[in-house]
Amino acid sequence: MNYQYTNYCCQSNITLPNSLTCTNAKIYVDVGRPNNCLGNDGDLYLDTNTNNLYYKIDGVWTLVSNLRGASGAQGVKGDPGSNGSKGTKGEKGDKGDKGSKGDNGEKGEKGDAGLNGLDGSKGDKGDDGSKGSKGNKGDAIKGEKGDKGEIGDKGDKGEDGLKGVKGDVGDKGDKGDKGDLGLKGVKGDKGITGDKGDKGEIGEKGNKGDKGDVGVKGDDGTKGEKGEKGTKGDKGNKGDKGEDGLKGENGDIGDKGDKGSKGEDGLKGDKGDIGDKGDKGSKGEDGLKGSKGDKGEIGNKGDKGDKGDIGIKGDKGDIGDKGDKGDPGLKGEKGEKGDKGDIGDKGETGSKGSKGDKGDKGDKGDVGDKGSKGDKGDIGEKGDKGSKGDKGDKGDKGDKGDLGDKGDKGDKGETGEKGSKGDKGDKGDKGETGSKGDVGLKGSKGDKGDKGIKGDVGDKGDIGITGDKGDKGVKGDKGDIGLKGDKGDKGTKGDKGSKGDNGSKGETGAKGDKGDKGDKGIKGDTGTKGVKGDKGSKGDKGDLGDTGIKGDKGEKGDPGIKGEAGTNSPFIGTFIDNVPGSGTTIVPFGAIFAYLSAAGGGGGGGGISDGNGSPGGGAAGTVYLYPLTVTSGLVVNYTIGSGGTAGTPVAAGGAGGNTTITIGTLNFTLNGGGGGGIGGTVGAINGGAGGSVTTPLGTTPGGSGGVGNGGPLPGNGQVGLFAFSGAGGGQARTNGASTGGFPGGQTDSNTFGGGGGGASGFAKGGDGEQEIPTTIPAQSGTLGSGGGGPTDVSASGGRGGDGFVRLDYYSA
């Protein structure tokens, strides 16, 4: 397998702690425990009998780990691994002799689909087959619409076009994309798999099917918002003079509400003037019938006055154009007579009639029988407000009549004596059917109608002319998947007829019973070939084609130039990353052993707030040449800690970030060093503490930071197996502590010098700032060591050193 490597380089040296000597370290592999006479410090020994790994230190072989480990519980099945890198290309083989072409075999019976054959080499282009003849087009007879029939029998299969002449079998080509699914023919003898034919023409568009039966009236929709104000109606004829009623105050004309869903039928009021018919909207939900204005309180019936002149009837509004009639819904059951509806919005005041003669006061008439409530007329559109008429003479106050039924609120006239309720006007002529009212709220979607019987399987559409046999084998661009052919002998599905115009939406009645399935529409004539449709759904999987003949073996390539003789070294390469942040790397091909070296981020030197010096930062924990067994392709995950920020006059030094590494089941944590405090601040002048190290072999604690005001000096880092903890940073005028032979940062003890940074396992700590004889600013740490502390000259400490990760790979 080949792997792509990043950040690999040739073997480079790693600075050793001064306390170790690992020059020319070796790895021994043998059976049994090693003898201390064998090898030198720094060597490794693998006992193949027990898989124990030993490391020689101070002349003694020390057991550090067992590579086998106890069998763990069966893990959860992992996700499929990514494809491995492509292997190296083998040498080209010799070209084989080309076999002579065999005779075509007899056509055999169609067998079961075989397994997919191996992809062959691209074969030679086969000869084009003859184009088959186009089959005859079947006639589509339109029958009369009858009752919904059962799904018809499957139509006869149209005649297949002539089969193209079989071309010579070419060498097996690369496996092509699945071709369009052709019409399934009658299963015949297994033929030679032909090449994909040209896409047949799309059938002609079918005739529009007969209109389906009217659905059952849906439930009444909810009352809609009040509709928009309509145009002013034509002036009506002058009616008989009514008795002067008490003239009410002119009310404000209410805004016409938005049309809402259809409300419950109220009591049918007197028929109003027919308003202009509005333009037919798209059939929508029945809007709410315009809300009637608020019902006024019934006033005391005034004395019957003389009948005043009836105001001139407004001109009748022009009848609007009749909208297209929608499909009528089934007439719903007549609803119960509803409560009298609220009084509608006040219409515009009609032209003032001429003043009538004052009549004699009449005797109080008997209360007439209440007339039967007339059918409620269609509510006309609200007319424009007419000019106010002249005030008539006040008639003599008549006897108070019985309270009549509240009529629809008329136009407010001038206040006269309240007259007896006028006779109910004749029912107006029924207005022309307005455009079908907006359909009430759309009823819940009815059960999906049975799928219209699939048009009788149309006569099998003309079979597309058998395409010329394409070049066999060459993998063409994947063709557009054709329209999915009807399975089996079914004729090609005709184009879906264009959607019929939506009829005006009828009033939504109560949800009716599921209607009978509509009659199947006559299959329309085949339309002209349409533009290429969108890619159709994937057709049924075709029969497995015959395995093509394996191509000839390619010619053997020229031998490559002989490479230079390599050195016999097990070293493969080194991976290094010293940029803070997270990353991954992959164990390279051939590697079975590796050494890990890494460091966390060092702590930053402190700040200063007065003339005293400030402490240094602590160093991070480190790992040095930790031995590992690895496998090619293993992913190593890591996070590199950054060095702590330098202190300022108002802020202490920042702590270094932790470095973590995960290699298989092994985890390493290298804690960053602590930041130095702020000089001159009580309780905050201590040096930063060193970071600890945790490996599979245990935890090594870090050194403590120096304590200000004459407290304890900083603690040195500790040495563990392949691990060095960070040393503590020194307080003001104190050197930082050391680790593994690397000293801490130095300070100028004769002045108010800054404390030195702690040392890491790979570098000395940053020196503190000095003032005499010249001012030298505090130094930053490197490779995880701590930064030096400042004096009051700069007041800012050195930054902590960033961490890093390094892996050296070996094949043996």
From Swiss-Prot:
InterPro entries: Collagen, Collagen_superfamily. One of its GO terms (cellular component) is virion component. Glycans are attached at residues 13, 83, 502, 637, 658, 667. Residues 71-568, 730-802 are annotated as: Disordered. Residues 69-128, 143-502, 506-565 form the Collagen-like domain. Residues 752-765 have a biased composition (Gly residues). One of its GO terms (biological process) is extracellular matrix organization. GO terms for molecular function: extracellular matrix structural constituent conferring tensile strength. May be hydroxylated on lysine by the viral-encoded procollagen-lysine,2-oxoglutarate 5-dioxygenase. It comes from the Viruses. Residues 88-112, 121-435, 444-523, 531-561 have a biased composition (Basic and acidic residues). Keywords: Collagen, Glycoprotein, Hydroxylation, Repeat, Virion. It is found in: Virion. May participate in the formation of a layer of cross-linked glycosylated fibrils at the viral surface thus giving it a hairy-like appearance. PANTHER family: COLLAGEN ALPHA, COLLAGEN TRIPLE HELIX REPEAT. This is Collagen-like protein 5. It comes from Acanthamoeba polyphaga mimivirus.
